[in-house]
Curated annotation (Swiss-Prot):
InterPro entries named among the record's database cross-references: aa-tRNA-synth_II/BPL/LPL, B3/B4_tRNA-bd, DNA-bd_dom_put_sf, Phe-tRNA-ligase_IIc_bsu, Phe-tRNA-synth_IIc_bsu_arc_euk, Phe-tRNA_synthase-like_B3/B4, Phe_tRNA_ligase_beta2_arc, PheRS_beta_core
Binding site for Mg(2+): D328, D334, E337, E338
Protein name: Phenylalanine--tRNA ligase beta subunit
Tree of life domain: Archaea
Gene that encodes it: pheT
Native source organism of the sequence: Methanocaldococcus jannaschii (strain ATCC 43067 / DSM 2661 / JAL-1 / JCM 10045 / NBRC 100440) (Methanococcus jannaschii)
E.C. numbers: 6.1.1.20
Recorded catalytic activity of this chain's protein: tRNA(Phe) + L-phenylalanine + ATP = L-phenylalanyl-tRNA(Phe) + AMP + diphosphate + H(+)
Pfam families: B3_4, B5, PhetRS_B1, tRNA_synthFbeta
GO molecular function terms listed in the Swiss-Prot or TrEMBL record: ATP binding; magnesium ion binding; phenylalanine-tRNA ligase activity; RNA binding
UniProtKB keywords: Aminoacyl-tRNA synthetase, ATP-binding, Cytoplasm, Ligase, Magnesium, Metal-binding, Nucleotide-binding, Protein biosynthesis
Subunit structure comment from the entry: Tetramer of two alpha and two beta subunits.
NCBIfam families: pheT_arch (TIGR00471)
Amino acid sequence: MPTINVKKADLERLVNMPLEDEFIEEKFPMMGVEVEGIFEEDGEKIIQFSINPNRPDYLSAEGLARGFRGIIGIETGLKKYDIESSDVKLYVENVETRPYIAMALVKGVIVDDYVLESIINLQEKLHWVMGRDRKKVAIGIHDADKVKPPFYYKEVSGDGIKFVPLNSDEEMTPREILEKHEKGIKYAHLIKDDKFPIILDSEGDVLSMPPIINGELTRVTTETRNLLIDVTGTDKYAVEKTLNIIVTALAERKYGKIHAVEVIKDNQSTIYPNLKEDVLETTSEYINKVLGANLTPGTIINYLRRCRLDAQFVDNKIKVFIPAYRVDIFGEIDIAEEVAIAYGYNKFSGEYPIIGTIGELNQLEKKCDFIREIMVGFGFYEVINLMLSNDEVLFKKMRIEDNNYIEVLKPASIEHRIVRKSILPLLMETLRINKHKELPQKIFEIGDCVVIDENAETKSRVVKKIAGVIVDNETNFNEIKSYVEGLLRELKIEYELDNFEHPSFIKGRCAKILKDGKIIGYFGEIHPEVITNFELEFPVVGFELEIE
């Protein structure tokens, strides 16, 4: 889990009360934050906190103080942040590689060395927790007084512009930054097809080249009083939430005032930041059933307010208002968790379930364990991938046209929005990630896939499958056929083989596996186009088989 260091004096200033060490160590765990240690550094008392990744709003002293004021009851409810209007505009051109951007101003901040360090630390922690090391989200924080609006967000070629990157005194082109600058070298893999996102002001000065580096021109110093924040990325939800976390944290500082920026794209205007709260509904009956408690609606509402939410009891339901900087509340169960946090986990007592049976391993899992032993005996290594992926990996790279799949309604990431119906594409992606490793590579995975089934109660069905791939200099159809037949023989499955045309395999080099006339799997030589799509350079063979 990420950790942050906070000066005790600063925390006391933000909480607005003196805090004893014992009080800190007792109360912060109540809000899900571990106190890793309290120590002296350069004459200052420092507190190290360990933050759960699902609470990125706690990655700053400001966010911690806001939550702490609620949990100890000195300031409860959803905090409202005033957003002042401005005439600042950002015009967005077609930026294919990072299509989403949000921007805001925070004026009147007082930045000393510690606050400056705190801002930079928050930025870097969010790059990891929200941004997947800048791949999904990248943040730029600038001295707003050094540039002149309106601003422009567009793509340029590698030699299309020159500017001085942060921590440098030399003008460079975007391509030169990737070759010479420390950050450019580190994040060069995030730039594709010689398309470089750039943020400019009205005079053509460069603020940022996301997700690589800011310009030296807008460096934030202790003299800075007005901050301009940009957040770019591949996921709109993550971009907007990241901006909300930053501006609300900065607004916790004395004199910090949030100012809006109008973002204009395709003749449509959006005002950022959008701090409108989300709304969910629950009931006291549901909360009490989940927690095993007997709380009145009024008590539940009070507990929610201590977690810095707001709530109202309307028509026998509890309407819950969730602040715009929270990214961890999606349904009723999350509301129940908030109540449990404020109520105090230490107040819950356990009960032994009244069960008169003895558990044992599921028969299907026993079969899967047996298959694992067989595959390891064949020299394969087991891998485990996520069940969520995207159409690029599951279909486009595999040369498959398929619209019959299950998609997540509100995905946390654009890269993880489709429930897989096949394991083979994810094994190809694993080979791509490990293409620098020595050959041969033989990997397999056993796992669940989800297919649409209109006759099922949930309109879907979970299918247990095994898939395997081999990449080597000279692998071929006969090699994968021998492994598949060996596996079927060990499982004592009576089967037939027949020719099969599958877009991911070479025509005439693919076979289907039939059991009682039904297709239960297939294998063969992967199509060269698929191999190229996954950036591989050697032949690949693979198979996929239903286990149940």
